[in-house]
Structures are given as C-alpha cells and as structure tokens.
A protein has these predicted regions:
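Secretory targeting and sorting signals
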Residues: 1-26
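Residue-level hotspots at or immediately adjacent to binding/recognition sites across diverse folds
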Residues: 26-345
Length: 345
C-alpha cells in the first residue's frame, strides 16, 4: 500500500552517531536525485521492468494544495524521463503502478467522485486500454502478473473487504469480509504464490494474519498471530520459501520471516521501515530507504536532507540499483515537487 514517511531536513545521524540495537554499519553508496518534475506534487509509486524501462506515477496539486484529477505518469527509457498522457483519463488520479513486462503496465487511481470507484488503465505496448471496474469498487495494491492475471484487494458495493482477480474479461471476488480478515497488502513472486497480509480480530485485539494463493485456491497461512496496534501488516513474497510480513506497533518495528519451514520473528531498529521490505540483490533486504539487513547485521543509510516525504523502495531488475519515490521541496520554495532518488550498491 502507499505509505509515506514525512521528513524535515531528514537524517539518521545524532550527536553521538547512529543509534542501533546491535551492530550497524554504513555502506559506500548513497541516495542521489535523478529526476524532479517541475510541478507541485509527489510520486506515489514506481515500477521497474528493466534499467531502460521504468514507470512512475503520482499526484499533482493546484497552488491551493488541491489534488488535480489527471493521472501524473512519467516513463524512463534509459536516458531520460518523459511525460506520458493516458487518453480520456481526465477526472481520475494515478495512485499505483504495476508492470510485469513492457506490454503489461497497469496504472490505477480514483475517480473524482464520492463513491470511491477505481479507474484502471493498461499499456499493452502500443496503446492504453481501459480495464472495466464495477461501480463502487475500490482496488488497492494491484499486482499485474500478466494481461489476463492480476490480483488486488479492496472493497465493493457488497463487501467491505475482499480480494479480486482479473481473468482478462472481468474481476472475480474471492475472500469476503465474513471470514474475519481485513486485507492490508498484496505481493506475489508468481502466479502460484500470491500472498495477502492483513489482520483479524481476536476478541478486541487486532492480530497479524495472511492468506496465500497456491494457483488453485486461497488458504489461510499457518503462522504466529502477534498483536499489533499501528501500521501494516505489509507483505513481500520473494518466493514460496522466502516471505516477509512487517508491521509497526506503537513504539517498535517488527517482521516475520518464512523460510519455507519455519517462521522467525524479528524486531527492527527505529530507522528500519518494516512496511517496505525489498531484496537488495546481494542476499540482504532493504527495510525502507534507511536500513539494510544482511544476516543479523543492520546497515544504516541516510537519505539526503530535505523537507517533504518519501515512499517505498523499488529494485531495478537485474541490478543492485534502487529507486525511491518522493515529494521534495526544491529551489528554496515551500512547494513540494515529484522526485525520484536512486541508490547503487
């Protein structure tokens, strides 16, 4: 899901150095800015197909700070970022992007109305095609695995919480809210390994829970069910034997790791974001933009000092380079502008 960390002259270092529970190191890399659009707004999400095919979507605002309902889309072709116009898309936002190939790029957002209806467009390599969405249906966290295979969670006019599947012609409903499960995030490593994380109620408490699609049916995951009371839980499915679920409670960051046989519990340092866990390509994992976990060692990373906010980390496939979508004040102005940072390990 789209979540932001707000920064004000952001940095991790304190007068006494980096504060960590245990060993922390510093890498030789650094986040650096690679693109900033000259409009008020922010990037919500990026999707990298290759180092020469990257998509970014976001929101733009009026000078009064109101959202402009027109999808804000940028594409990187390996040498430059260019503006992309989706025909006949006025009246909607661009909240998320998902891509499995150059001919399968999905962009979605909300209509400018009071019914919370999602609008979805797919780039097929030649043109944009509008994907039909039932009225009063709100799709979040869409994972586009193929032109005829996409998963999402959200709500509809009949169900408060549900999981949806696109089969090439329509959206099908799977899990409904009567099962006592409220989805919060979705991730997939392939068509037979799709995970949805969320929470259930145990008495008056919220506990972490998950479901997995094995290619044929959704099943509840046998796992620990810790209590949480803040943000998450979010999921990263790297493979059937490598899955991470992260969340916050009031004071601490937590994660569960599935190694194919057992669940392992992890408490993360304060600068680690358990809602954005991404493999680093070297056997470690980014926890947001400011922490890398390799084995049991945490590496603290700094984002450049700025005022604004940033979202999730995206790995560029086939590389150890990463992108960070953000909204950053620039040029001495208080106007936040859509910005992309990059990190090379």
């Amino acid at each position: 899901m789209k979540r932001w960390i707000v920064a004000a002259a952001l940095g991790l270092a304190t007068a006494g150095g980096i504060v960590t529970p245990g060993t922390a190191q510093a890498s030789s890399g650094a986040w650096y800015r690679v693109y900033q659009a000259d409009v008020p707004g922010s990037f919500n999400q990026t999707a990298a197909i290759s180092k020469t095919n990257i998509w970014a979507v976001g929101d733009t605002y009026t000078t009064a700070g109101k959202t402009i309902y027109q999808p804000f889309v940028r594409h990187f072709n390996g040498s430059s970022w260019r503006a992309i116009t989706i025909p006949h898309s006025s009246g909607s936002t661009a909240d998320w992007v998902s891509a499995s190939a150059a001919s399968n790029v999905w962009v979605g957002g909300l209509k400018n109305n009071s019914t919370a209806t999602t609008v979805v467009y797919r780039w097929n390599g030649a043109r944009w095609v509008k994907i039909p969405v039932p009225a009063v249906t709100y799709l979040q966290g869409v994972i586009a695995l193929a032109p005829r295979n996409a998963w999402a969670f959200g709500s509809s006019g009949t169900e408060a919480y549900d999981i949806f599947h696109w089969n090439g012609s329509k959206w099908q409903h799977y899990l409904a809210n009567y099962i006592n499960f409220i989805p919060q995030d979705i991730s997939a490593s392939g068509p037979d390994n799709v995970w949805v994380s969320g929470f259930a109620y145990s008495g008056s408490k919220q506990v972490v829970a998950a479901y997995r699609w094995n290619g044929a049916v959704w099943r509840p995951v046998s796992m620990p069910h810790p209590v949480f009371d803040d943000a998450g839980p979010d999921v990263t499915a790297v493979s059937p034997s490598n899955v991470w679920i992260g969340w916050y409670d009031t004071t601490t960051s937590h994660a569960l790791h599935w190694d194919g046989h057992h669940w392992h519990t992890l408490t993360a340092p304060y600068y680690a974001d358990p809602l954005h866990i991404v493999p680093d390509g070297k056997g470690g994992y980014w926890f947001g933009a400011q922490a890398i976990l390799t084995g049991s060692t945490w590496t603290a990373e700094q984002v450049p000092a700025f005022t604004g906010g940033f979202g999730d980390v995206t790995r560029i496939p086939g590389t150890t380079s990463f992108l960070l979508n953000a909204g950053v004040e620039a040029g001495g102005s208080s106007t936040v502008k859509p910005t992309i940072f990059r990190f090379d390990l």
